[in-house]
């Protein structure tokens, strides 16, 4: 049951991101959440806590006039580890160039109804490998 509940936590968080509802997102993130971006993605590095999440998000969104995440699937690896496969679309700020990235993966560790870890990767394989290394 915990895995199913955590799938819903991840879905609600990604939906809140698309709405721009930062309060709803923060309510689903542990106060000490670790946010990680794989070296192949933007905003590479590790960010900590709600402030870190906000900084990470702002750095990413500053590059885009429009940006949206479409969730294809949220997969429970076990009771607390999940991977969301998404398609991302956006239009660059200034350039106006439209970009579409398919199959972008987010990894999550969710405990007590809140994400304690969130990672961004270009592939499911990279997300899964990182989750396994963090266990």
Regions found by a protein language model. Give the residues of each.
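Short, aromatic-enriched amphipathic alpha-helices that serve as compact interaction elements
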Residues: 3-21, 28
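Generic anion/oxyanion-binding catalytic loop in active/binding sites
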Residues: 14, 42, 116
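A beta-strand edge to alpha-helix "cap/lid" segment located at domain peripheries
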Residues: 1-5, 58-135
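A general boundary/transition motif marking the beginning of the first structured unit of a protein
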Residues: 1-2, 13, 44-48
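Residue-level detector of alpha-helix boundaries and kinks
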Residues: 10, 38-42, 93
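A solvent-exposed, acidic/Ser-Thr-rich amphipathic alpha-helical stretch
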Residues: 24-80
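Generic alpha-helical secondary structure signal
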Residues: 4, 8, 23, 51, ...
